């Protein structure tokens, strides 16, 4: 089991729930835009958010951002440890450094002293896109990713700094898995999971679900980020669904059949219409295209419909309640979901 750290108001590691992260894609110095995006991410279920800090203005903007948001802010630092120090002084709750480009040992030691004084955690995050050549020459890429991060961790420890999170991300699923398995055998710091440069929506969803899901099932990982080339809110939604699928989160879900020639209703349209409402109400709702297997397959759902020639059969926990016309399916389901009651009206 990993150690437990406290990042602002979030407990990370140990027996605590897996924490969902994302990263803004706004210019951090554009404070109002960044605040809006962070609040959108928080509304979607994000619990910690990372912001890029490429310059002094971005580092100093963290102070203003912190005044308007209610989740921990992580400052993403490359190359310049002085920006990390400035971000800490501006109120960052956690720092991410890249061992591939942060520089010589004295810089890490200097950063560790300031982070220790301010009680701020550091994530050492290695990345396949910025591995040092000497590590690549000594090891296979997965081991190089892991050893690169572990070396930086050892420098922090020498400075008496143990408020550490560690990560190793590749754009390759297998490399990501192997690197994190390696790390989990060496240290007990909380591990942040993700696949870097995972791509656009579909590709990222597949890669992230496999790598993150596999590692979490093995008991590896304390916080996750799904990386998507696009709207970061989608990252949070997918992360939630990964955790829900692994029974690490409990929230509502729509189960729906893949449809075939027996389908009598527009399964996809109905499912999409009610999905957001279902998730908020912590129910399982089944939308099945026909009655052949629909009631049996959706029998464990709190509420469900199965299409018929003239409409749909409404069932609850596998028991048929009544039939409803096609044009009333969404209306009836919505009423039941909102009321969370067996009253049919």
Curated annotation (Swiss-Prot):
Its cofactor is [4Fe-4S] cluster. It is an enzyme of class 1 (oxidoreductase). [4Fe-4S] cluster binds at residues 257, 260, 290, 297. Keywords: 4Fe-4S, Iron, Iron-sulfur, Isoprene biosynthesis, Metal-binding, Oxidoreductase. Gene3D superfamilies: Dihydropteroate synthase-like, Sulfite Reductase Hemoprotein, domain 1. One of its GO terms (molecular function) is 4-hydroxy-3-methylbut-2-en-1-yl diphosphate synthase activity (ferredoxin). Pathway: Isoprenoid biosynthesis; isopentenyl diphosphate biosynthesis via DXP pathway; isopentenyl diphosphate from 1-deoxy-D-xylulose 5-phosphate: step 5/6. Its EC number is 1.17.7.3. It comes from the Bacteria. PANTHER family: 4-HYDROXY-3-METHYLBUT-2-EN-1-YL DIPHOSPHATE SYNTHASE (PTHR30454), 4-HYDROXY-3-METHYLBUT-2-EN-1-YL DIPHOSPHATE SYNTHASE (FERREDOXIN), CHLOROPLASTIC (PTHR30454:SF0). NCBIfam families: ispG_gcpE, PRK00366.1. Belongs to the IspG family. This is 4-hydroxy-3-methylbut-2-en-1-yl diphosphate synthase (flavodoxin). It comes from Pseudothermotoga lettingae (strain ATCC BAA-301 / DSM 14385 / NBRC 107922 / TMO). The gene is ispG.
